[in-house]
């Protein structure tokens, strides 16, 4: 192995997307958006379909000049109500924020993180406000915490990943990022040269224009194998 390749194989910082990678935001949001739609008089609309449209609107806003996550969520709800021809109050987004304390970790998370302790520093990196991350039960403390609020920017344009590299005292040879989102994790990290493990829990096909990840896993259980053995 060349020196550069050897370094690339030995990450000292492993970062994780939170919502969708560590925490089941899809399941938790379905309940919250069901409440939002009922209160907006649109109980006939499929909550998951509506949530996916709302999430796509959020991601489009991540590319714009920084606004707090809560503001983006409210603006995207207003837009999605209009798209679905629903006369709803965008302040109903409070039901989504209230749900954060109920979001559950995926069953593979605790075991995998425990296996990584002592082998690399662990980070979380999330398009989120600090208070919402604090309300989320991650089950453990992380060595490095990076949020959109702290970085004053989001993942897709690279702002949050550049903040991660600086805050984590890492470079592209010593960082492995694990994330589920094609349009935030892969689009934001790969152009910076960051090694990415796509945690493809739902078995999706990579969308056109999305950079190819370095690794693709169905859950987090394979992440420790991406690090060198401790006796190497």
Describe each PLM feature range:
Residues 1-14, 45, 110, 114, ...:
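Asp-based, Mg2+/Mn2+-dependent phosphohydrolase catalytic module
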């Amino acid at each position: 192995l060349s020196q550069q390749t050897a370094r690339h194989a030995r990450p000292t910082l492993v970062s994780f997307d939170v919502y969708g990678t560590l925490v089941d935001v899809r399941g938790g949001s379905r309940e919250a958006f069901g409440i939002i739609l009922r209160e907006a008089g649109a109980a006939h609309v499929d909550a998951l379909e509506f949530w996916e449209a709302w999430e796509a609107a959020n991601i489009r806003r991540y590319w714009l000049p920084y606004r707090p996550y809560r503001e983006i969520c409210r603006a995207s709800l207003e837009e999605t109500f209009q798209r679905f021809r629903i006369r709803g109050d965008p302040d109903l987004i409070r039901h989504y924020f209230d749900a954060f304390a109920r979001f559950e970790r995926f069953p593979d998370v605790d075991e995998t993180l425990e296996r990584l302790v002592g082998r690399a520093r662990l980070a979380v990196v999330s398009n989120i406000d600090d208070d919402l991350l604090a309300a989320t039960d991650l089950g453990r403390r992380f060595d490095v915490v990076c949020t959109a609020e702290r970085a004053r920017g989001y993942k897709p344009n690279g702002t949050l990943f550049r903040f991660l590299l600086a805050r984590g005292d890492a470079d592209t040879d010593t960082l492995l990022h694990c994330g589920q989102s094609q349009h935030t994790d892969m689009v934001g990290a790969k152009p910076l040269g960051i090694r990415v493990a796509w945690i493809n829990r739902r078995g999706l096909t990579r969308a056109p224009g999305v950079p190819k990840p370095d690794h693709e896993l169905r859950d987090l259980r394979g992440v420790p194998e991406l690090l060198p053995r401790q006796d190497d």
